[in-house]
Amino acid sequence: MKNDQRRLRDRVAVFACIAIAAIAIDQLTKMWALSALADGRTIRVIPGLLSLTLVRNPGASLGMGSGMTWLISLLAMAACVALVVLAVRTISMKWTVLFAFAFAGAFGNLIDRVIYAEGFLNGKVVDFLNYGWSIGNVADIFLMLAGVAAVLLLFLGEPFSQKDLDEANGKTLGDDANATDDGAKAA
């Protein structure tokens, strides 16, 4: 039991450190964009691929949901709570890291929706990374990385819970008792 508590403590510490650092990076880059790009200028980083342009986005990714900012904010709050719960419940450090980045992305954009709100949770997200087909921010990158990592972890069969680990190892609840019976039958 002590080992489980230590692992939980370690996962919580990793989650907190990654989430705090990632949120800080997101917010610092947004502060920079608000000051450096406020005059409407565009900085070309990689011509044709990436430029820096300040946009205030009332919606979600790819401009969807611009009329439902309050709903997007409530969903982001629910997602943040769910990600913390998942991080505490998993036995996998890989899943913990994924949840920390997803939390940082959701919370980073939620901060904007609260800070820059003129009404109930209707603030606009600070976007400045212009890819030509979409404009986003560092929080969006964290969310995208978490999504890709989730697909990879699922594809690779990374166990989320002790039950998943036991199933991956071919164990079920009755396996310990059946192992002696099977061994006796085989002899």
From Swiss-Prot:
Keyword terms, alphabetized: Aspartyl protease, Cell membrane, Hydrolase, Membrane, Protease, Transmembrane, Transmembrane helix
Alphabetized NCBIfam families for the sequence: lspA, PRK14771.1
GO molecular function, one term: aspartic-type endopeptidase activity
InterPro entries, alphabetized: Peptidase_A8
Main location: membrane
UniProt record, GO biological process: proteolysis
Family, per entry: Belongs to the peptidase A8 family.
Region annotation (Disordered) ranges: 167-187
Role: This protein specifically catalyzes the removal of signal peptides from prolipoproteins.
Its membrane topology: Multi-pass membrane protein
Gene name of the encoded protein: lspA
Keyword Cytoplasm: no
Entry GO terms, CC: plasma membrane
EC number(s) stated in the UniProt entry for this protein: 3.4.23.36
Protein name: Lipoprotein signal peptidase
Cellular localization per UniProt: Cell membrane
UniProt catalytic activity: Release of signal peptides from bacterial membrane prolipoproteins. Hydrolyzes -Xaa-Yaa-Zaa-|-(S,diacylglyceryl)Cys-, in which Xaa is hydrophobic (preferably Leu), and Yaa (Ala or Ser) and Zaa (Gly or Ala) have small, neutral side chains
UniProt keyword ATP-binding, yes or no: no
Residues annotated as the enzyme's active site: D127, D140
Pathway(s) per entry: Protein modification; lipoprotein biosynthesis (signal peptide cleavage)
